[in-house]
Design a protein with these regions (language model features):
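Bacterial signal peptide processing site
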Residues: 19-22
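Short beta-strand->loop
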Residues: 125-133, 178, 214-220
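Acidic, polar ligand-binding/catalytic clefts
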Residues: 79, 88-152
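Extracytoplasmic small-molecule ligand-binding "clamshell" domains
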Residues: 31-114
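C-terminal motif of bacterial Sec signal peptides marking the signal peptidase cleavage site
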Residues: 14-17
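Short helix-initiation/N-cap motifs at beta->coil->alpha
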Residues: 91-101, 162-164, 178-192
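A ligand-binding cleft/hinge motif common to bilobed small-molecule-binding domains
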Residues: 115-123, 169-172, 196-220
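Bilobed "Venus flytrap"/periplasmic-binding protein-like clamshell domains
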Residues: 57-59, 70-83, 135-185, 202-207
Length: 220
């Protein structure tokens, strides 16, 4: 039985807020603070390029196709935004745990990576565009696992990106966090019995299971 959690996410593009010091993210075109959006658009137009932080390893949102081309839903939305603005787009592939720090430091203009701005800290630090997709969170464990709900992960090794919303949720549930770079590594560690579960985006997990039907893991 597929169980979704309230920790879902509306996807939008995320940008650093003007003068803020906390954070929040999504994946589409900037539109929360008029001042932040206006100054960002002006800067992008002056450069002629929008610089985008993304993982490149998080299908179906940001990944490389069989020819090695960076693609995915968030990537293509960002390309459409750049085309609308009449500027070029430059993607900088970055591990998730460095993504928001990179945005705050000015390495990117926006982040496009299925980001959820749910924590008060992120909401204070970052702005986001209008949402363009919605996805819930699911818990994944091995096929032979007795884990049935998030209540069962207290004290359990749970593979998570430490700075993600999912990592925060797992920690709050009492899980023992096993640091990873992304979803694929999380699921590999579960298969190898080096971790017992992971909490992550429903669409990303379903995409992985479709491509890896013999993975030995399930949504609980």
């Amino acid at each position: 039985m597929l169980k979704k959690f309230v920790l879902g996410g509306m996807t939008a593009l995320v940008l650093a807020a003007c003068g803020g010091e906390g954070g929040s993210a999504s994946s589409s075109a900037p539109a929360q603070s008029a001042n932040a959006s206006g100054s960002l658009i002006e800067r992008i137009n002056n450069k002629g390029t929008i610089t985008v932080g993304t993982e490149g390893t998080y299908a179906p949102f940001t990944y490389h196709d069989k020819d090695g081309k960076l693609t995915g839903y968030d990537v293509e939305v960002t390309r459409a935004v750049a085309e609308k603005l009449g500027v070029k787009v430059e993607f900088k592939e970055t591990q998730w745990d460095s993504m928001m720090a990179g945005l705050k430091a000015g390495r990117f203009d926006v982040v496009a990576n299925q980001v959820g701005l749910t924590s008060p800290e992120r909401q204070a630090t970052f702005d986001k565009s209008e949402p363009y997709s919605w996805s819930g969170a699911v818990l994944v464990a091995r096929n032979d696992s007795n884990i049935k709900s998030i209540d069962d992960i207290k004290g359990v090794k749970t593979a998570q990106s430490l700075t993600s919303n999912y990592g925060e949720k797992a920690k709050a549930a009492g899980a023992e966090l096993v640091p990873v770079d992304g979803l694929a590594q999380s699921l590999t560690l579960i298969e190898q019995k080096r971790a017992d579960a992971t909490l992550n985006d429903e669409l990303a997990v379903l995409d992985y299971l479709k491509k890896n039907p013999n993975a030995g893991v399930k949504i609980v």
